[in-house]
Design a protein with these regions (language model features):
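Beta-strand elements within well-structured catalytic alpha/beta cores of enzymes
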Residues: 4, 56-63, 67, 84-89, ...
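Flexible, surface-exposed loop/gating regions in the mature catalytic domains
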Residues: 35, 47, 52-57, 100, ...
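Histidine-centered active-site microenvironments of extracellular/periplasmic hydrolases
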Residues: 72-128, 140
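C-terminal cap/loop subdomain of S1 sulfatases and analogous C-terminal strand-loop tails that border
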Residues: 93-105, 137-145, 149-215, 220, ...
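Catalytic-site neighborhoods of secreted/periplasmic enzymes
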Residues: 1-5, 11-14, 106-108, 182
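Long, internal low-complexity/basic segments
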Residues: 3-9, 15-28, 32-51, 59, ...
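Active-site rim elements
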Residues: 45-60, 107-109, 128-139, 152-160, ...
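Surface-exposed alpha-helical segments enriched in charged/polar residues
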Residues: 68, 72, 240-243
């Protein structure tokens, strides 16, 4: 039934797994009840709905069961000690935070809120990756390929063309520190964003709306500081870095800022 939470009106039906009864009539602190964000364009019928919360919680726990089955199968086949296991996702999900239910393309304009961008990224490889460690570096999906290839001793397999934006965090997997610029870049069709330790800046083609958040003072992204007095130097620096990144790495065919078309056509071309 598609991504987490099912699809269509199925999200208001009970999940068909062993967790459905456990979550029935539960109060979910992780799903805040808030006024609907004016940009919410899809999933409006699920907003603040107990049934939708129960469904998403049960299906998330169902994913945990699936991971357990995979690990049990690796153990049964004698492969669990020499297999690198990576748990990741393609995108995040907002469960009522900021008044939004869903992913980045469930708002118009497309969103770049923190929970839309955050994904799990867990590695397991006994003997080579120490268990129980966490890392506070800002990393992105585009860092995955060079990091894993270097970790496996296959760094020479990294393609030279097209030029890739990914960085190598394999040192972190080995328990060392890495020379790391703590910044990530994000794009979904007409929406682009840069996230640093301190700031998140969001730009949209062709003329906004724009967003600027102080992620230290406002981690829940409640107060858009774009255009506010005193923030112009931070905005200008973020905008310049964002433009430089995509001028280097964007595929010209899909570079909306320079005449390209939308890659997935989730919104008007």
């Amino acid at each position: 039934e598609g991504h987490a939470g099912g699809s269509g009106h199925a999200r208001l039906n009970r999940a068909r797994n062993r967790h459905a009864d456990y979550y029935r009539d539960r109060h979910f602190k992780s799903f805040p009840v808030d006024a609907m964000h004016p940009w919410q364009s899809a999933n409006k019928q699920f907003h603040n709905q107990q049934a939708a919360m129960e469904r998403l919680a049960a299906e998330t726990s169902g994913v945990d069961d699936g991971v357990g089955e995979i690990m049990a199968t690796l153990r049964r086949l004698g492969l669990d000690e020499n297999t690198i296991v990576v748990y990741a996702a393609d995108q995040g999900w907002m469960g009522g935070q900021n008044g939004i239910w869903g992913m980045g393309d469930h708002t118009k304009p497309f969103g770049a809120h923190e929970l839309m961008m955050q994904i799990p990224l867990l590695f397991r490889q006994p003997g080579r990756i120490s268990a129980g460690r966490t890392c506070d570096y800002l990393v992105s999906n585009y860092d995955f390929l060079p990091s894993v290839l270097h970790h496996l001793g296959l760094g020479e397999r990294i393609p030279g063309r097209p030029r890739l934006p990914g960085r190598d965090f394999s040192a972190v997997l080995a328990g060392r520190t890495a020379d790391w610029d703590n910044v990530i870049y994000y794009e979904m069709e007409d929406t682009r964003a840069i996230r640093t330790d301190r700031w998140k800046y969001v730009a949209r083609h062709p003329s906004g709306p724009f967003e600027l958040y102080d992620m230290k003072a406002d981690p829940q992204e409640r107060f858009n500081l774009y255009g506010q007095p005193g923030t112009e130097p931070s905005r200008a620096d973020a905008a310049a870095r964002l433009a430089a990144f995509f001028s280097t790495y964007a595929d010209p065919r899909f570079d909306r800022w320079n005449g390209g078309r939308n890659a997935a056509r989730l919104q008007a071309p």
